[in-house]
């Protein structure tokens, strides 16, 4: 006959289960974090080409291109103290993940006569990575 009280056994069981989940997080969580890190790191590498013309932190001055800080949810071609070309001033869309993906795919199709020296990213995976990275670094 087991002399350990029911309450004590229950406490031990809860402790063991809690310890297992603390030491070994669920596999899906590990895979998701790894995938997100993979895209973030790829986006960071891709963005190195962008920083020659763009800044991305609050209160940084513009370069050849506008500061990208706070771009998601903002109307394209509208940034305080930046003089956009007529093509950009006439842009009629809000920056979202979808519009940025379309722009990154073919910038000159989306904004004809756009002066930005960027021909686009054909790789959907690269566009996804750059968008994930930008969402992390340019949002307030």
Where do the PLM segments sit?
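N-terminal secretory signal peptides that target proteins for export/translocation
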Residues: 1-8
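C-terminal segment of classical bacterial N-terminal signal peptides
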Residues: 18-31
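Electrostatic cytochrome c docking/interface patches
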Residues: 29-47, 58
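The canonical Cys-X-X-Cys-His
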Residues: 43, 48-56, 130, 134
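Detector for the c-type heme attachment site
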Residues: 54-60, 73-74
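Short cysteine/histidine-rich zinc-coordinating motifs and their immediately flanking basic loops
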Residues: 62-67
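Short Fe-S-cluster ligation motifs
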Residues: 78-98
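C-terminal capping alpha-helices of c-type cytochrome domains
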Residues: 94-140
